[in-house]
A protein has these predicted regions:
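Bacterial N-terminal signal peptides
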Residues: 7-15
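Bacterial N-terminal signal peptides that target proteins for export
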Residues: 1-7
Length: 201
């Protein structure tokens, strides 16, 4: 009886293992509705990595190079691995303050990037962005003209898709070597935060 039972148990275990093996594929099966257009909003912090420009330092001023940041973006996901995205980001203020005076610089950026995604599970992906930016720099000094700068931007993050139309991101992005000329100087701006994504179909 035992000799007859052992082959039967072995066959049963082998049959049960086949569906599990078939499910363990890479990349994972895709969540529904991941293709097509999407829009989103981002919230977090921005930091001018090189501090305050020389033009607004001195005179006993203290530099505050970090500020709340928000952004809006729209994109189109071509397939599970690639998307294209345009975005606007308010990079906040850099402030140099003293007991009797203060100077501020406000920065905002438009960007156009390619997005590469790496699926980890059915709903969770890592991603990277690479593209270009155009930054507007504005001073609180009325006699100083605004400045524009263009350059490269890149980002790393993770995305979770709910399975419906919504997704959530955590993301770090750098706007590299923002060159505003003699007054504004050169700075790197980093943003760190979360974003909510809504798929339009």
């Amino acid at each position: 009886m035992k000799k007859n039972l052992l082959p039967l148990l072995a066959l049963t275990a082998l049959a049960a293992a086949q569906p599990a093996r078939a499910q363990a594929v890479f990349p994972p099966s895709e969540p529904p509705s991941v293709y097509g257009p999407y829009v989103g909003a981002a919230f977090g912090t921005a930091q001018a990595r090189r501090g305050c420009p020389v033009a607004i330092q001195g005179g006993g001023r203290v530099c505050d190079d970090r500020d709340p940041s928000w952004g809006l973006f729209a994109g189109y996901q071509l397939n599970r691995y690639f998307a294209a995205e345009v975005g606007y980001r308010d990079l906040g203020f850099v402030r140099a303050t003293a007991p009797t005076s203060s100077l501020t610089i406000h920065s905002s950026a438009w960007s156009l990037v390619a997005v590469g995604l790496v699926p980890v599970t059915e709903r969770f992906s890592g991603f990277a962005k690479f593209g270009g930016y155009r930054v507007l720099l504005e001073s609180s000094q009325g006699d100083v003209a605004d400045a524009h700068a263009t350059g490269l931007t890149y980002a790393l993050g993770a995305q979770f898709d709910t399975g419906g139309r919504f997704g959530v991101r955590a993301e770090w992005q750098r706007y590299r070597k923002v060159d505003g000329g003699a007054f504004y100087g050169v700075n790197d701006y980093d943003t760190l935060g979360v974003a909510l994504l809504f798929r339009l179909r």
